[in-house]
């Protein structure tokens, strides 16, 4: 199983993008320049028609990608053309995996250099079949923990976790306001008592000020909605500059 610590030094810069937004050409050009960016780990959002965990901005981006014909096959074709030293993680809804076939999907993802899967709507209790395939192909199925998750459930969730722990810093959908820093610090301490895996904080982190604050709390910071916003205007040079601004030290 991949050790995500090898992809960053002091703190991980984790970004999220919707593949195919604002168009396939921009996505591909961005991925070709990924190694020149401050991003250590990139979550690749696979567009889905019912993105229940996503806020309006990401949901709209997914719709635009879908309207242009971006599907799981074009995602795989795109990634086959990409070579990068950075860690790639799929953020994908379970129905897409199930429809493609669990083993077939995980095997294909592994062949394309994917290190891990994040499946936001899949509960721990329903994840056995996917865990089995991920273990077979040495891909991490990422565990999500909320600040509101009770301690005993945290212990249960992280016991067999792989890759990293995704700590949801806000309650609800992506792009919403983050909870108090002190609450997050307490949750990180609680999680650390059960696992040595790195803990990355995401949801509600909107700008460089937020990133700098969260670096003091966790091992990595995940920025989603604000990164997707950078892509709206479509100019790659501006996109790269905006991403550098979000993650600057």
Swiss-Prot record:
**What NCBIfam families does the database record attribute to this sequence?**
trpA
This protein's source sits in the domain of life called Bacteria
PANTHER family reported for this sequence: TRYPTOPHAN SYNTHASE ALPHA CHAIN, CHLOROPLASTIC, TRYPTOPHAN SYNTHASE, ALPHA CHAIN
Q: What pathway is this protein a component of? A: Amino-acid biosynthesis; L-tryptophan biosynthesis; L-tryptophan from chorismate: step 5/5
Q: What would be an example GO MF term here? A: tryptophan synthase activity
Name under which the protein is recorded:
Tryptophan synthase alpha chain
Keyword annotations of the record: Amino-acid biosynthesis, Aromatic amino acid biosynthesis, Lyase, Tryptophan biosynthesis
Organism annotation: Campylobacter jejuni subsp. jejuni serotype O:23/36 (strain 81-176)
Quaternary structure?
Answer: Tetramer of two alpha and two beta chains.
- Top EC class of this enzyme: lyase
Please name the Gene3D superfamilies in this protein's record: Aldolase class I
Give the active-site positions.
Answer: 43, 54
């Amino acid at each position: 199983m991949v050790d995500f610590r090898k992809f960053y030094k002091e703190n991980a810069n984790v970004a999220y993008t919707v593949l195919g937004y604002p168009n396939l050409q921009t996505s591909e050009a961005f991925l070709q320049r990924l190694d020149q960016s401050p991003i250590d780990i990139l979550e690749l959002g696979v567009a889905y028609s019912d993105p229940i965990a996503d806020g309006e901005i990401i949901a709209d981006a997914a719709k635009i990608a879908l309207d242009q014909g971006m599907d799981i096959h074009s995602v795989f074709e795109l990634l086959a053309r990409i070579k990068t030293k950075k860690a790639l993680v799929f953020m994908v809804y379970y129905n897409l995996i199930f429809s493609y076939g669990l083993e077939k999907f995980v095997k294909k993802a592994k062949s394309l250099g994917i290190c891990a899967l994040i499946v936001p709507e899949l509960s721990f209790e329903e994840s056995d079949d996917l865990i089995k395939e991920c273990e077979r192909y040495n891909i991490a199925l990422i565990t999500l923990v909320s600040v509101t998750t009770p301690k005993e459930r945290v212990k249960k969730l992280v016991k067999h976790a792989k890759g990293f722990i995704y700590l949801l810093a806000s309650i609800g959908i992506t792009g919403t306001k983050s909870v108090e820093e002190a609450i997050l610090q307490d949750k990180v301490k609680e999680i650390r008592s059960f696992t040595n895996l790195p803990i990355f904080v995401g949801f509600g982190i909107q700008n460089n000020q937020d990133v700098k604050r969260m670096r003091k709390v966790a091992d990595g910071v995940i920025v989603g909605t604000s990164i997707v916003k950078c892509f709206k205007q479509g100019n790659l040079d501006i996109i790269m500059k905006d991403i550098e601004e979000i993650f600057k030290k």
